[in-house]
Amino acid sequence: MNYECLARKVLESYSFIDPVFEFLRHNENITYKVTDRGNNCSFLLRIHTSVTEGFYGIQHTLDGLESETVLLQELGLNGVLRVQMPVANRFGKYVTGCRLENMDADIYATLLEWIDGDTFTHNEENLDEIVYAIGVTLARFHLFTRASAALKKLNRPVYGVEKIDNTLEKLRHGVEVDIYSMEHYGIMIEVLTQVKGIMRELDSHDGAWGLIHTDIQRGNIIITDNCEPCFIDFCLCGYGHYLFDIGSASTIMESKQRDIFLKGYTSQAPFSKDSLRYVEGLILMSIFLCYAFFIRDSVRNGWIKDHVERKVEMWKEWLTGKEIYYLL
């Protein structure tokens, strides 16, 4: 598929004068930086077709995408976070359907405002300040989604017990194609069974569940010139336990920075280190979700075999009750 041809077709629904395309990446979406030479403004164009079948989900549907734009607007218009605000097309819609002549169905696309800055590298000179600010930003996001009535019933993925069962079914394929052994798969089952127990415990805690980002990684945090961390790429956002985001964010920090991150978080929202066992389990869940995204893609799943072999002993230790938060 000629992606730039598709991108140009999408932009016919917007009021660009002289667009210049810069391909960024193709993971859960095809993304381009689009700069309009007519006014020198830049935007992020997302064409919602995934690089591998494992990424596809409700987040790629019209309802799912419209729900994501609601989240971005709620965050931006209420001044909660600086986010990439959605841009309406010439018909007043935030999601644009597009189909080339050789395509059987529409592909959806969205256009977002561009945020200038650099992706978080963990090598910044003022690292402690930025890590603390990431904790603050995440807490503010969680406080808002916990309280916002507008965000309670969006059409988004759900990261609960059923998601774990679905993930385990997908991971069985890894044994079938000899990516890892049945013994390794059995340990994954044990780990995720414990995680399901953790989820049931958390469900009895007030305010433990709500709309979360789910994909906080270094490439999804932009550090602006004034050192403000901005979360981007809410494509996988959905309903889950808030500790899931704390876990994801923790793993992008080196161990010695994690307490600084947690200090930033607790400056705005409640969190106790007594919850670290829960956080560890949800980190392991996020790892297995990532395996499931790629497990059937023979071109892109080669890293999983090595990763399992390097991490399986740690999983065993976690099953015995050992703390691994600062090792993950």
Language model regions located:
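Active-site acidic catalytic loop and adjacent metal/ATP-binding pocket
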Residues: N27-N40, L44-L45, P86, K196-F244
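ATP/Mg2+ or Mg2+-diphosphate-binding catalytic cores
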Residues: F293-L328
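All-alpha amphipathic helical-bundle segments outside canonical DNA-binding/catalytic cores
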Residues: E129, A133, N155, K273-I283
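A short linear hydrophobic-aromatic micro-motif
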Residues: I17-E22, K273-R277
